[in-house]
Amino acid sequence: MKYNDLRDFLAQLELRGELKRVDIEVSPHLEMTEICDRLLKQAGPAVLFERPAGHTIPVLGNLFGTPERVALGMGQTSVSALREVGKLLAYLKEPEPPKGLRDAWDKLPILKQVLNMPPRELASAPCQEIVWEGADVDLSKLPIQTCWPGDVASLITWGLTVTRGPHKSRQNLGIYRQQVIAPNKVIMRWLAHRGGALDYRDFCQINPGEPYPVAVALGADPATILGAVTPVPDSLSEYQFAGLLRGAKTEIVKCLTHDLQVPASAEIVLEGYIYPNETALEGPYGDHTGYYNEQETFPVFTIERITMRRDPIYHSTYTGKPPDEPAILGVALNEVFVPLLQKQFTEITDFYLPPEGCSYRLAVVSMKKQYPGHAKRVMFGIWSFLRQFMYTKFIIVTDDDINIRDWKEVIWAITTRVDPVRDTLIVENTPIDYLDFASPVSGLGSKMGLDATNKWPGETSREWGRVIEMDAAVKARVDHLWQQLLF
């Protein structure tokens, strides 16, 4: 199923019983977080708060609160079908010419999808039906959530931040939280390795003292939203990838303030600039780790215009101790990662990011081991392959006889196949998430790899244990008798 815009997606969710409308007054200050948190933990529906206290603009929450809704948003019928999205990304990351007529025919569906990649620019768009400028630019008129009691201020959480670097023709879409500090100002919290921060750094180096154009789109169509959180190859824009997911070109429109282009169907758009040397101390906020983070200085985004659709919807979320919406996104996107990794490392049989690991901090990998030391090669490969895994602190590697999505099997492999000295790899002074207060220095810490594979000659001098297995004929005999037994 493909969706033209967010409203089309919500209409389809409502038909499936996956959207709940709340027509009683609910406050964006803490109450919406508590409701969405309970809904998510029950695998409940998305929720549209139609009467947010003190506001007339409804608030959409828990939109991607189940992996199934993430899959639907990406145009797939099931979570398992997201493997096909991963295969498409793997092909686009390292395309191969057809090996013959049959191979060319097999690749024809992909080539047809590629035709939907270039976005289509419109002269006018729904997202610009209403325009606030000058004194009318006032973020307090939007029902922006305050998520946790210790949060310093209200926080924009689901904005798609649009940037462009001086060396790139394509634009970058990223999701960075934004603390409201004035009617027309927010703090743009982007980490140094993220696309928006890299674009901004490059711009400042070439254009010192110049204001940097930025736009933030709220309530885009699901393909565009999810494109911003998917490991899209650097050569591909999120708008192009959204077109592939949707099966139709992404419609964009030029901002009224500068030349950046935003999703034409977005519900609300913030347009403006980051002015030179304007920074502010951000936080503390409750985060996906389950803790309040430290304060840190980031650039200030000054909003010159706010444009929106008629009767707009404000899309929001919260982050907290898993499970939260980012953790659910991680569960779904895990299926996208598997084919990407398998194309680069054919020995990998499965890859799992447990949601309890705060989306990406712990990864478990199963593999077909081929030589001594192979597990360590896989560890280093994962840490360096995708930007998303640069901050993964722990990697556990097992043989392919272990179901890595079953913690009982993983723990069994660790406790029976690991010697702590021989099989623990420690790498010091590596990039670490700034939110990770466990690291001794902000942004710099260590990583651990655990080799829970069976050991080969050269890795041990002892005879290795053999796994106990019942005789196959006996199992077949008991299968036949089972219905006759009184169990």
Swiss-Prot record:
Origin: domain of life: Bacteria
Record GO biological process: ubiquinone biosynthetic process
Keyword Lyase recorded: yes
Residues annotated as binding prenylated FMN: 175-177, 189-191, 194-195
The keyword tRNA processing appears for this protein: no
Gene (UniProt): ubiD
Active-site residues (renumbered): 287
The organism of origin for this protein: Nitrosomonas eutropha (strain DSM 101675 / C91 / Nm57)
Main subcellular location of this protein, as a coarse class: membrane
Cofactor(s) in the UniProt record: prenylated FMN; Mn(2+)
Enzyme class: lyase
Protein's membrane topology: Peripheral membrane protein
Cellular component per GO, a single term: plasma membrane
UniProt function note: Catalyzes the decarboxylation of 3-octaprenyl-4-hydroxy benzoate to 2-octaprenylphenol, an intermediate step in ubiquinone biosynthesis.
Name assigned to this protein: 3-octaprenyl-4-hydroxybenzoate carboxy-lyase
Catalytic reaction equation(s): a 4-hydroxy-3-(all-trans-polyprenyl)benzoate + H(+) = a 2-(all-trans-polyprenyl)phenol + CO2
Positions contributing to Mn(2+) binding: 172, 238
HAMAP family cross-referenced by the UniProt entry: UbiD
Enzyme Commission numbers on file: 4.1.1.98
Description of how the protein assembles with itself and partners: Homohexamer.
Gene3D superfamilies, per database record: Single helix bin, UbiD C-terminal domain-like
Pfam families (alphabetical): UbiD, UbiD_C, UbiD_N
Family to which this protein belongs: Belongs to the UbiD family.
